[in-house]
């Protein structure tokens, strides 16, 4: 792939346009959350006003179990989007992931793009997670990655594994050989918690087994399953590259979010776990947490509000959180721990 910051910036803008204007959801593939029912308790003994949504992730307190998912950075429009997202996160006491910071690794023109990730001024207290691609995470790149994280004031690093997206992208990084070893080495060298994530095609049992076979065991501090059922980045990249779907079967390939949550939680009972990929409602969040996730992440539904204003983002998220609170109340869970204890019922 080209390392030209101008080309990266142009592609980022095309990503935004396609996600706003085209149908980029999976077709015929769902999150799988509809196959579970949150038990309804007609005799709940909770008070809606007293429901406690507070959570903790990577040692940071959150007023609700929500992260704003990784979206953008490097395009001219990205700065406004990220500042509006970060402002809403600060107001609501939730976390935020930045979009890929690859463009910041360039020594020259890439530095101009760094301003699109600069959100600490409006979000001084937010759990802020930086972002780099697994394909770019070489040992030689670690000092530049660390510098990029320091520059934005990040608390942690998300490393996105996106082999299918890269395969669909013009000039994409398609050599992932040795990437597990590089991930282990980078995690050892970086003084930040590392969150391994997909981009919407899912992390499941097979990937976790590969991680656990590495010398020293699991090299990361947490997993974001980023499952199938929401935005398909294989679909996005095909639309950006060709203006149409050349490979429709590849546009709808992935591990559904619910399946990914269950598989990863079974393999890693105590590791911080993010549920993302098609999380659209408070009920989706409640089911995901009941299945074992610690927090959920939401991305594309916030893109259009973020172009409008921070208040529009806040309003969207407040409705989401209000629904989540009612879900806990009406299943008799005063807090998130109780929600996990109650669990969900599989629909046969």
Curated annotation (Swiss-Prot):
Signal peptide: none
GO biological process, one term: isoprenoid biosynthetic process
Function of the protein: Involved in the biosynthesis of isoprenoids. Catalyzes the 1,3-allylic rearrangement of the homoallylic substrate isopentenyl (IPP) to its allylic isomer, dimethylallyl diphosphate (DMAPP).
Natural source organism: Mycobacterium ulcerans (strain Agy99)
Keywords assigned by UniProt, alphabetized: Cytoplasm, Flavoprotein, FMN, Isomerase, Isoprene biosynthesis, Magnesium, Metal-binding, NADP
Cofactor(s) the protein needs: FMN; NADPH; Mg(2+)
Cellular compartments annotated: Cytoplasm
Main location: cytoplasm
Residues binding Mg(2+): 166
GO molecular function: FMN binding; isopentenyl-diphosphate delta-isomerase activity; magnesium ion binding; NADPH binding; oxidoreductase activity
Name this protein carries in UniProt: Isopentenyl-diphosphate delta-isomerase
Enzyme class: isomerase
EC numbers for this chain: 5.3.3.2
């Amino acid at each position: 792939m080209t390392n030209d910051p101008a080309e990266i910036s142009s592609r980022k803008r095309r990503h935004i346009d396609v996600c706003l204007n085209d149908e980029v959801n999976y077709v015929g593939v769902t999150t799988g959350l509809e196959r579970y029912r949150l038990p309804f308790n007609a005799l709940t003994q909770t008070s809606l006003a007293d429901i406690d949504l507070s959570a903790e992730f990577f040692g940071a307190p959150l007023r609700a179990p929500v992260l704003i998912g990784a979206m953008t950075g490097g395009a001219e429009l990205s700065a406004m989007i990220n500042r509006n997202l970060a402002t809403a996160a600060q107001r609501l006491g939730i976390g935020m992931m930045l979009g890929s910071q690859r463009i910041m690794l360039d020594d020259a023109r890439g530095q101009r793009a760094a301003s699109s990730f600069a959100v600490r001024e409006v979000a001084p207290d937010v759990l802020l997670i930086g972002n780099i691609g697994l394909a770019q995470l070489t040992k030689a790149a670690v000092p530049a990655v660390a510098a990029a994280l320091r520059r934005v004031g990040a608390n942690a690093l998300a490393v996105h594994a996106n082999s299918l997206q890269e395969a669909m992208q013009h000039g994409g990084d398609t050599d992932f050989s040795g990437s597990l070893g590089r991930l282990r080495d980078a995690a050892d060298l970086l003084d930040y918690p590392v969150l391994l994530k997909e981009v919407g095609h899912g992390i499941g049992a097979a990937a976790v087994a590969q991680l656990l076979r590495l010398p020293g065991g699991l090299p990361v501090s947490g997993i974001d399953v980023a499952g199938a059922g929401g935005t398909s980045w294989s679909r996005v990249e095909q639309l950006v590259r060709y203006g149409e779907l050349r490979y429709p079967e590849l546009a709808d390939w992935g591990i559904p979010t619910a399946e990914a949550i269950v598989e990863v939680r079974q393999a890693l009972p105590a590791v911080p776990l993010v549920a993302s990929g098609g999380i659209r409602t408070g009920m989706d969040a409640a089911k995901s947490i009941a299945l074992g996730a610690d927090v959920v992440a939401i991305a594309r539904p916030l893109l259009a509000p973020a172009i409008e204003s921070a208040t529009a983002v806040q309003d969207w998220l407040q409705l989401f959180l209000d629904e989540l609170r009612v879900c806990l109340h009406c299943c008799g869970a005063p807090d998130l721990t109780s929600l996990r204890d109650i669990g969900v019922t599989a629909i046969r």
